[in-house]
Amino acid sequence: MTFNIINLETWDRKEYFNHYFNQQTTYSVTKELDITLLKSMIKNKGYELYPALIHAIVSVINRNKVFRTGINSEGNLGYWDKLEPLYTVFNKETENFSNIWTESNASFTLFYNSYKNDLIKYKDKNEMFPKKPIPENTVPISMIPWIDFSSFNLNIGNNSRFLLPIITIGKFYSKDDKIYLPFPLQVHHAVCDGYHVSLFMNEFQNIIR
């Protein structure tokens, strides 16, 4: 996948990037999202919720360059043409989880079929990363389906090198005849401001309606 290098000296975000990159500033925003219609739709069509959410998340990311901006293995700042989801799958027997990646696709049906095939192959491997090699252009997505929450924060001590979003979904719940989902989005302030987080949340909510 193509990685497009950003010239920091001419980048209009240079001042902001340097400030927050040196501060190592990350932050997380958790929003309560209405998934009532999405739940009804996937139930009627026989789909599972998790891959539907993964597909919607990656759709938003791949529409917006800011969420694909990062640092590659050679230490260059830039952005990938697209990101692939690297998502967690729980093993009930061992109580461990695996991280599996599946190639993204604009078609949900095609993505869903690939997701199911990868699940069959790798979910019982009892390895942290059973599907190898893992491409550089992946975005971490996970779900904690046993508990709902109002906030979530994940800290990475990597000297600010990880700039991509991190998504950790909570357990959905019912309220006022609707179904809601705790949806935390964690970003690095060097590349993402509050405006961009709002953009992500609004686009995601529109997709799942």
From Swiss-Prot:
SMART domains linked: CAT
A Gene Ontology BP annotation from the UniProt entry: response to antibiotic
Catalysed reactions, semicolon-separated: chloramphenicol + acetyl-CoA = chloramphenicol 3-acetate + CoA
Record has Acyltransferase as a keyword: yes
InterPro entries given in the database record: CAT-like_dom_sf, Chloramphenicol_AcTrfase_AS, Cmp_AcTrfase
Active site per UniProt: 189
Example GO molecular function: chloramphenicol O-acetyltransferase activity
Domain of life: Bacteria
PROSITE patterns for this protein: CAT (PS00100)
The EC number(s) this enzyme carries: 2.3.1.28
Leading EC class: transferase
Keywords associated with the record: Acyltransferase, Antibiotic resistance, Plasmid, Transferase
Function noted in UniProt: This enzyme is an effector of chloramphenicol resistance in bacteria.
Summary of subunit composition and partner proteins: Homotrimer.
UniProt similarity note: Belongs to the chloramphenicol acetyltransferase family.
NCBIfam families found in the cross-reference section: chloram_CatA
Protein name: Chloramphenicol acetyltransferase
